[in-house]
A protein has these predicted regions:
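Alpha/propeptide regions of enzymes that mature by internal proteolysis
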Residues: 1-329
Length: 329
């Protein structure tokens, strides 16, 4: 058992600046991040597991309509919601994930269910919802996930024949309105909407969890990096726990989360150096914008991003004061 414990979380990354939101909205984001941090950190403070801490922190963010996950999930091209989530236990490298769920209130709970109650790692679409329902997880009708802001974003995207990453400016396509391109060129002015958390508990165990609603106006059952173990989510007690946020296609191609772990394991790099290499030297040159939160086995925290901002927070037993930030410093 170690005396160290730490929790870090994020609520998305992208073109985020003081000019892009009102002071009131900024305070709402900071309060929501702080609340999720307090919930997860309280678990660690009483000797609870890293798994419980990251799950509860992510559930708090899923319940907040400000973030593109759970209740605040964006709309697909067809006007419904397809949510993804993943969780991983660094102690034994067990993992569970769901993709394309439409009814489960907290997708991260469904991901935990896959890990704990099945022999599988990734379940999707009606089958994943059915498993959640069978095990008594809270389910919600479509109107629970309706937010006016997200609906307005969908209407704008449909009218423009575009697809959006979270509640940002659109990704332009040359396809006709009735059939927008599945993977358009990236617009430099956007936000990537995902929530996630990583933790180290007093028992020396690491865990990671990630949840997202994906892209506004997405179709063809598009899946990003969030539910893919090793790309958007990863945890290994020997190295680190990682939760990513960004343009998922690039994070998938770069296998970001696992790459950071490998740099630490095979090259002996520190957490901060491994994160810097992947986020700034590997992702950025291929057009991958976004960031991540990470914690290592010693309780060191890293929150790198190559975008203009990232909703983020962390707290450690070594520095008990909570840290909450949005913009570049």
């Amino acid at each position: 058992m170690t005396n160290s414990f730490a929790l870090a979380l994020h609520g998305g990354a992208g073109t985020i600046s003081p000019q892009s939101m009102t002071p009131e909205k900024e305070q709402e984001y900071r309060a929501a991040l702080g609340q999720a941090l307090a919930i997860g950190y309280a678990v660690l403070g009483r000797g609870g597991s890293a798994l419980e801490a990251v799950e509860l922190a992510v559930r708090s963010l899923e319940d907040c309509p400000l973030f593109n996950a759970g209740r605040g999930a964006v709309f697909t091209h067809e006007g419904h919601h397809e949510m993804d989530a993943a969780i991983m236990d660094g102690r034994i490298r067990a993992a569970g994930a769901v993709t394309g769920v439409r009814s489960v209130q907290n997708p991260i709970r469904a991901a935990r269910l896959v890990m704990d109650k099945t022999e599988h790692v990734l379940l999707g679409y009606p089958g994943a919802d059915a498993l959640a329902r069978q095990h008594g997880l809270p389910m919600q009708p479509p109107e629970y996930f309706f937010t006016q802001q997200r609906y307005d974003q969908l209407q704008e995207a449909l009218a423009e024949g575009r697809m959006r990453l979270d509640h940002s400016e659109a990704l332009e396509t040359e396809a006709p309105l009735q059939e927008p391109a599945a993977f358009p060129n990236e617009d430099p002015k956007k936000k990537m909407g995902t929530v996630g958390a990583v933790a180290l508990d007093v028992h020396g165990n690491l865990a990671a969890a990630t949840s997202t609603g994906g892209m506004t106006n997405k179709q063809y059952s598009r899946i990003g990096d969030s539910p893919i173990i090793g790309a958007g989510t990863f945890a290994d007690n020997r190295t680190c726990a990682i939760s990513c946020t960004g343009h998922g296609e690039f994070f998938l191609r770069a296998v970001v989360a696992h790459d950071i772990s490998c740099l630490m394991e095979y090259r002996g790099l520190s957490l901060s150096e491994a994160c810097r290499i992947v986020v700034h030297d590997k992702l950025a040159p291929i057009g991958g914008e976004g960031g991540l939160v990470a914690v290592d086995a010693a309780g060191n925290v890293a929150l790198p991003f190559n975008s203009e901002g990232m909703y983020r927070a962390y707290q450690t037993s070594a520095d008990a004061a909570p840290f909450v930030a949005i913009y570049k410093e």
